[in-house]
Amino acid sequence: MKKLLCAVLLSPLLYSNAVLADDAKQLRETLNGTESLKADFKQTVTDINKKVIQTGAGVFALAHPNQFYWHLTAPDESQIVADGKDLWIYNPFAEEVVIMDFAEAINASPIALLVHRDDATWSQYSVTKKQDCYEIKPKSTDAGITSVNVCFNNGTLNKFNVLDDKGNLSQFDLSNQHSISAADKSLFKFVLPENVDVDDQRLKTQ
């Protein structure tokens, strides 16, 4: 009787974990089917009271393995480039470039998770499917990002949003989606501008 009771009590938990695992697998399979993508985006940021505090626009691109490009062109320019090994963050206004190991890319830009195929990295997140969208949440309680939602239309990424721990919601709507061309591959090669300060935070190997 006790064994039966335990089985009844535990079965919802086991089912829930199985569903979450299936959702994560399905998301990764969908992402794996997108070898590359380039799109324009429009950004809207709202605060915890749903007041619009910023709007913007730019160009977004990704390619497997571990290549990522993010160029905010308005209102203030900024650029994030992952070349598969290193992550470059460029702030033209501050004339500064920060360089990180790609392993740290997700902390700087959680959307980089979309090109991450590393099992250990994905194991740090839970995934829940909601219709055509997937909610990705870090398991760490001290993460600066509360959740990332990615949405697809017929298998094509068409929007995503990022909720931070202060309640700010950044929403991105994509348009003009297409696979990257041979010429677009240069997007993932960051060219260091002249006369900028460089903050190299990469872990130095012995």
Curated annotation (Swiss-Prot):
Compartments, as annotated in UniProt: Periplasm
Listed SUPFAM superfamilies: Prokaryotic lipoproteins and lipoprotein localization factors
One GO cellular component term noted in the UniProt record for this chain: outer membrane-bounded periplasmic space
Signal peptide per UniProt: 1-21
Stretches of the chain forming a coiled coil according to its record: none
Keyword Heme: no
CDD domains from the UniProt entry: LolA
GO biological-process terms attached to the record: lipoprotein localization to outer membrane; lipoprotein transport
Keyword terms of this UniProt record: Chaperone, Periplasm, Protein transport, Signal, Transport
Oligomer status and interactors: Monomer.
Family: Belongs to the LolA family.
Function: Participates in the translocation of lipoproteins from the inner membrane to the outer membrane. Only forms a complex with a lipoprotein if the residue after the N-terminal Cys is not an aspartate (The Asp acts as a targeting signal to indicate that the lipoprotein should stay in the inner membrane).
Name of the protein in question: Outer-membrane lipoprotein carrier protein
Species in which this protein is naturally found: Shewanella sp. (strain MR-7)
Gene, per the UniProt record: lolA
